[in-house]
Structure formats: C-alpha cells, structure tokens
Amino acid sequence: MAIEPLTIKIPEEKIEDLRSRLKNTKLAPDFNNLDWRYGTNREYLESFIQSWIDYDWSETENEINSFANYTTTIENLPIHFIYERGEGTNPMPLILSHGWPWTFWDYEKVIRPLTNPSAFGGNANDAFDIIVPSLPGFGFSTPLTTDGVQAVMTTDIWHRLMSEELGYERYAVGGGDFGAMIAQQLGQRHPEHVIGVYLTMASGARRSPEQKPDSVPPSTLETLLPLINGPTSRLNKEDFAPEETDWYERLETRWASALSHVAVHTNDPQTLAYALHDSPVGLAAWLLERRRNWSDNNGNIEEAFSRKFLMDLVSIYWLTDSFFTSARWYWHTFRTKIEPPKNPTLAKEIPLGIAVSPKDLVYTPKKMVEENANLIHWTEHPRGGHFGPAEEPELFIEDIRKFFRKLR
C-alpha cells in the first residue's frame, strides 16, 4: 500500500469522554506510601488527574502534526511513522525504534536537532533523515486486529519500510528498550543493509560457565535482545569487571522494579487490559509508576519528565485505545524464538555503538560486548535512565552524532 500523509485528529467526543471519566474517578485508599513502595502514590495521582482534566490535547496534537506524519500498510498492519528529511546533500537515513512504556513521542525532542543540526548549533554534515515509527499496536499504528505480531516481525516490517517504501538501500538504526532489540535484530537479519546499530540499552550475555540457579537477576528474559551472538542468560557478579561491580548491584535492585509488569504482560495481559482500557486513571497509574521507577529522578518523576510530557504519553495510549494491543505485542515478543543470523560473519561485523545510563534497568559487561560484537563506540553517561532520548535529549543527540560520524 502506498504511503499517505497523516494528520492526527482525535474526535472531540473522545476528549470529552476522557474528561468525564477523570472527573468521576473512584480512587483506592492509600497510606504509608510516600515513597511509592506499594505503587503509584495517591497524592501525586490526584494532582496528575486534576492537571489531566485541564490538559489541552489540541496543543499536543498540533505539536505532533508539526512533524511530517505518514501512514502505510505492511503485512496488512497499519504503520504510522514520522519522516523528516535532513538538511544538506547527503543526510544519513536513521530509523529510531521505541519500546514499552514508550511511544514514538519519546523522540520528539531529538528529531529536529538530528535533521537540521545547523539550526541548533551543530554541523550540517551530521544531518540525518529521521524515521520514527510507532510499533504495531502502539499509538497511531492502530487498530491492530492481527494476533501474533511481535518484535522479530516488527524488525522485518521496519526493513520493508526503509528499503521498499522509502527506497533506502542502506540505513542506520537505533533504539532503546524493545527498540534496542529491534535495532539489533535489523543488524542480525539484514546486515547488508545496515550501516550501524546504536543502542541506549545494552542487554544480553553468554551463559556463565558455572551457572547457579539463584544467580539473579536476568540481564533479560530468554528472548529479549540477543545483543551477543549466543544464548542470553543470567549474569553473575563475576561476569562484571571490578569497575563495573556497581552495575551488577544496580541490576539486582532495578530489575526487580520491572518484574510486576513483566509477569502480567507475559502471562495474562488481556485481563489487565479490561481494567486499563476502561479507566484512564488506572492506565496513568500503571504507566507513571514505570516511568518513575526506571528514570533518573531522585524520587521525583517530574525531575525526569515534564508533567505535560507525561500527560502526552498517557493520552496517546488512551486516545488510541492501544494499551491492550501494546501488551499483546509484548506477550508475543516474549514467546518469539530468535533465529541465528543467516550471515553470522557479516552480522558480527556491523558497527555497534552503546550508551550506558546510570539509572537504566539492565547492563551488560563491556568485555562481553567486545568479545562478541564489533563495538566501536561506548559511552557511559553521567546521568539518565531507561528513557534516554526523552530524559536527556542533549546527551542522546551528541552521542548518536559521534557514533555515526565514524561511519559517514
């Protein structure tokens, strides 16, 4: 199907329905939870609800529409994407993939500086053509009515988008969270077309020789992000270099904050979906807790994200009715077998760049990456968490330019 321009326009009755539900919310009691130990704090949520009632979606809609949005159909799936051309005569095509609980809007602050660097104090020679798609079943890549859609299938859809729909013979890839998995899989499955892979989450490791059953936490579940050519597995403290010991300690504590949603999303997401599809406040509580737990914010979520951005995030999920299909995509992704690359030699030669943030969820020892991939760029950021381009856009912009500058 041909690519068509897309103007985002949510019907006013849907906005009014959201406000009505917010005004008639019945909140559960909450006590002794100032530190969010039991989940989203009620006092913060009440304040957020009031802001959301007064929130002007049309402002965000106009901001989204200020970018060039398009839609197409690939594998009978609706695919939304932003496509902004870079300045100069030879911008590098770069597709950026998001994860969960992200949306395409997590890249909003980095798109224009990457496409038009000279307007932001940069060098026009660093320009990119930027493509930011919404994952199938997320945001405006809806409605999703096909079962079985997952990350590996998405990888091949992205390749078709870049090569067949947009006409790029070779292109660069980047991503975080599930977007990192997709970016890495593009390099594994289509290495002849990939210029380089840039990740803001490095996960995946070889199984330790003396694997202990209680050597938790996992660097990933079995199917998530095979960054290293080999089976992913749990990491032991001994796998980390002395200067990386605190990474393992962070891994132990921070991965625990992900287990609750992973358990539900990978077992019975539809049961949760009935609640969150009906209650915008329930949806907000579910998403906000993860954003707080996985970002660098000193216990205050709004040190990492503005309240408006958080309302944008939850509104995109709510107004597109996409929580349930995003969770279904999650379920299938964790049950997808990762196939070995058809050309392992070429796949291993793909240049790899990794940015490590101090408050991310998962970490991989640098030596494991160096031994098993063509690592040419490694950055350890001084701040930031799991949502790099949204939390620290300037660090993201500077670092991704540095990596791909080596490949121009």
For the regions a protein language model found, what residue spans apply to each?
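Glycine-rich "HGGG/HGxG" loop immediately N-terminal to the catalytic nucleophile
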Residues: 58-59, 120-122, 131, 135-149, ...
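C-terminal subdomain of alpha/beta-hydrolase-fold enzymes, centered on the catalytic histidine
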Residues: 265-408
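Alpha/beta-hydrolase active-site loop
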Residues: 146-165
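A fold-wide structural signal in alpha/beta-hydrolase
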Residues: 93, 127-132
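The serine-hydrolase catalytic nucleophile loop
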Residues: 100-114
